[in-house]
From Swiss-Prot:
Protein and nucleotide deglycase that catalyzes the deglycation of the Maillard adducts formed between amino groups of proteins or nucleotides and reactive carbonyl groups of glyoxals. Thus, functions as a protein deglycase that repairs methylglyoxal- and glyoxal-glycated proteins, and releases repaired proteins and lactate or glycolate, respectively. Deglycates cysteine, arginine and lysine residues in proteins, and thus reactivates these proteins by reversing glycation by glyoxals. HAMAP family: Deglycase_HchA (MF_01046). This is Protein/nucleic acid deglycase HchA. The active site is at residue 188.
Length: 291
């Protein structure tokens, strides 16, 4: 019989799906908290123009792991909501889209229940999270020369691996944003979206080759995340490894809250970077679009 410590590191069964699991109680005690490091969002001269930010969320909760288990995941709420809070306070409204138009899936076990900033922005955008636009339906508008979007934001959480990196719509959107000098904001596992422009293309033509980014370290997904029961098995593929194969340079080795800007690409290393990335994104967009 397992002792309590061993049991606490065992992933928790998710009864909604066959052989599916939430993170273990022990891993959640290490990785989640009731409050974030949010320390204010002071933007005395917010943007008052018409440009918005398009947030692409994941509409799939389950990732099939190498051992045939299912990881019950989604978007990480802090990674989504803290950057949204900063940008919203800076005057940039959000539209929300998923690949299918089905609701955004959130890792509610990571929601910081005592964090008023996160809770308030969640309440504000909950209707859009529950009834997002289908990305294909707004794609023509989004990539147009007169696009209403100043930036696209792809938050993290392992659920991002379930379609976004292989999406032709995401490929077209990111290619258009690069070509038209718009901003791309992403963190943790969200940079998996940067793989989309490589779909059905030659590696030597990859548009993010040579870019420097922050991203969640593969070493944690192959090490600690398995050892403490955060995931029920090895991921089907690794984000950093695949980006590096295409010529992307990863700056961080651990997770410290590091953020980085390379041209119009803004990235962060983990949930710990959520507040920092929100500040960087708000400052960057305000400087770019100040009137």
């Amino acid at each position: 019989m397992s002792n309590e410590r061993d049991t606490s590191r065992t992933p928790t069964p998710d009864p909604a799906e066959h052989n599916a699991f939430f993170p273990s109680p022990y891993s959640l005690s290490q990785y989640t908290s009731a409050k974030t490091d949010f320390d204010g969002a002071d933007y005395p001269t917010p943007y008052k123009g018409g440009k918005k930010v398009l947030m692409i969320g994941t509409d799939e909760r389950y990732i099939l792991m190498q051992n045939a288990s299912m990881f019950s995941t989604g978007n990480h709420p802090v990674e989504m909501l803290l950057p949204m809070y900063h940008l919203d306070k800076a005057g940039f409204e959000f539209d929300v889209a998923t690949l299918s138009g089905n609701p955004v899936k959130l890792e509610m076990w990571a929601m910081p229940g005592e964090d008023e900033a996160v809770k308030s922005i969640y309440a504000k955008y909950l209707p859009k999270l529950k009834a997002p636009r289908k990305l294909a339906d707004l794609l023509e508008q989004a990539v147009a020369d007169d696009s209403p979007y100043a930036a696209v934001f792809v938050p993290g959480g392992h659920g991002v691996l379930a379609g976004i990196p292989h999406s032709r719509e995401v490929k077209r959107l990111l290619n258009a944003f690069l070509a038209k000098d718009r901003y791309i904001i992403t963190l943790c596992h969200g940079p998996a979206c940067l793989l989309a422009p490589a779909v059905e293309e030659k590696p030597e033509d990859y548009p993010f080759k040579g870019y420097e980014i922050c991203v969640f370290p593969d070493a944690l997904d192959t090490g600690a995340n398995l050892e403490i029961g955060y995931m029920p098995g090895p991921l089907p593929w690794l984000v950093g490894e695949n980006l590096q194969k295409l010529g992307v340079k990863i700056l961080n080795k651990g997770i410290t809250g590091q953020v980085h800007r390379d041209r119009k690409l803004l990235t962060g290393d983990s949930p710990l970077a959520s507040n920092n990335l929100g500040k960087l994104a708000a400052k960057t967009l305000l400087e770019a679009f100040a009137r």
